Amino acid sequence: MADSYRKLIIERLEDVKQRNKQTATLYNNYSKLAEQLEKKHKYGTSSSNSSQLETGELARVKEEMAELYRSKCQNDQRLIDANHRIADFEKKSSAIIAEKIALEATAKSICAKYAKTEVELQRLKVDNDQLNDERIASNTTVTMLTKQIQDIENDRIHFLNKIRELNEQRVDFLNAEVALEEKRRNSRIQDMITSAVQDITDKDTKLEEMLRAMPDTNSNGDLLLGDSVPSRAEFVLECEEGEVNDVHWLDGETFATGGSDRNIKIWKVDGHGGYTRIGTLAGSNAAFTRIDYERDRKHFIASSNDKNVRIWNLDNSRLLSTLSGHSDQVTCVKFYQSHSAVSGSADRVIKIWDIQNQRCSRSLFPASKVLDVATNMGASPSLFASGHFDKKLRFYDGRSTDPVRTVDMGGRITSLDVTMSGCELLVSTRDDTISLIDLRTFQTVHCYSAENYRTSSDLSRVVLSSGNEYVAAGSSNGSIFVWNRNSTKLEKQLCSNSENAIFSLSWNPTGYGLLSSSKQKFVTLWK
């Protein structure tokens, strides 16, 4: 039985030897021991049968047998250890094989992705070529369209020049019509003067003495007879097709109106409760908002809702220039120093214009809608003021871009008017109050208000009388309030026949007579 096990072990070791060379030495040693053991076994059997062996030899053989068994045990242990190592090696080999399989799968996946990427790259190259072709075609189209735009722009400029020429021709025709009307009017006046002179037999010496005793004149050169508080309506003039935004005396007998009908009309008072239109200034494409007059050069300036400022020569009613540059309606304009003007707009920009060169010399950015401007301040010829929607009164020096002083008011500032001395400024605000500010200290000197007084609009205009004795303002209910400048006492409340809001007032340079314009095309002379 032991021999069969031994043979089985030897056969398995032989098989392991063939598969693994690392156990060859172990196998050889075990084979030798097995052969020696078998020889001893045979030798021991033959000796027992012959009974001739000596007892000492048998003991030696037993000792060798014991030694062989010990060697066998050691070799068996080594075999077990070798089997364990073989098992470990097989596990590691299996892990390596599994890892190899995984790596091969990963390699196949990477190769597939690479092939897919190659296909995608090829597709992108094709798309890129197509896009490049489209880009070239687009550039060609853009070049062609740019040329077309340039041609259209050239045509637009040509048409604008043509329109300008036609407008100039239209203005020339209007000027010719005005000149003809002026000539006819002068002829009628000359006939009237000739007829009147024939009835005069002697001079009124008393009147001459009275006029010599009154040498005072206002800043416009008109004889200042003294401020008089008006009490009645001399006449009511229906002059525009809509709102009359501004009215302005040019001298003691002539005044101008401007509003929604896009024309400025010049009127003359005959002194007997009547009036005559003596001229028309045209050229605007929208309603006029503010007008101003420079008597020395007979220049008339007006701001308009068509974003422009225009200047006329009043002698021949000829349009001298159109000042463009604002991006929104121009709310106000005033002559400023010599050969300059200041305009304010809803685009939150103040522009100083060089009238001679017909260009903007400086732009100021107060960051708020401009509602009115005031010039001719006595403190400095270059100083001017602007009233704004953000309730701030800003003072500028035309030589710099930042305000030199800012005064906070109680409401949106609708109107500014400077006293004859240039030392005080009248300010109207939407909180239904009017303030008189000392320009030397920038402090409020007087405040004017009344129970029924309501500021009519953001562009309503208040005025000082020619002699600076009174303050006048129009209300939203159609009434006109007159205060004493120094005492702030309400001297008079003039009530019109309608309840249309009063937009603008202008006091006659002689101090006798107040013009008012309303929302519904009416102008009233109060005396």
Curated annotation (Swiss-Prot):
| GO MF annotation list | protein-membrane adaptor activity
Entry-linked Gene3D superfamilies: YVTN repeat-like/Quinoprotein amine dehydrogenase
Query: Tell me, what is an example of a GO biological process annotation in this record?
Result: autophagosome assembly
Q: Name one GO cellular component term.
A: autophagosome membrane
Subcellular location per UniProt equals: Cytoplasm
- Report where it is expressed, by tissue: Expressed in neurons, pharyngeal muscles, body wall muscle cells and intestinal cells.
Checking PROSITE patterns in the record gives:
WD_REPEATS_1, WD_REPEATS_2, WD_REPEATS_REGION
The record's InterPro entries line, in alphabetical order, gives: ATG16, G-protein_beta_WD-40_rep, WD40/YVTN_repeat-like_dom_sf, WD40_repeat_CS, WD40_repeat_dom_sf, WD40_rpt
Which residues, by range, are in coiled-coil regions? none
Q: Where are the WD repeats?
A: 239-277, 283-324, 325-363, 365-406, 408-447, 454-493, 497-527
The alphabetical list of record keywords is:
Autophagy, Cytoplasm, Repeat, WD repeat
- Per the record's keyword annotation, is Cytoplasm included, yes or no? yes
Which family, according to UniProt? Answer: Belongs to the WD repeat tipD family.
Subunit structure of this chain's protein: Homodimer (via N-terminus). Most likely a component of a complex at least containing atg-5, lgg-3, atg-16.1 and/or atg-16.2. Interacts (via N-terminus) with atg-16.2 (via N-terminus). Interacts (via N-terminus) with atg-5. Interacts (via WD domain) with lgg-2; the interaction is direct.
Function, as annotated, reads:
Most likely a component of the atg-5-atg-12-atg-16.1/atg-16.2 complex, which is recruited to the preautophagosomal membrane and associates with lgg-2 to promote autophagosome formation. Although its role in autophagosome formation may be distinct to the role of atg-16.2, it functions in a partially redundant manner with atg-16.2 to regulate autophagic processes.
- Protein name from the UniProt record: Autophagic-related protein 16.1
State the taxonomy lineage.
Eukaryota, Metazoa, Ecdysozoa, Nematoda, Chromadorea
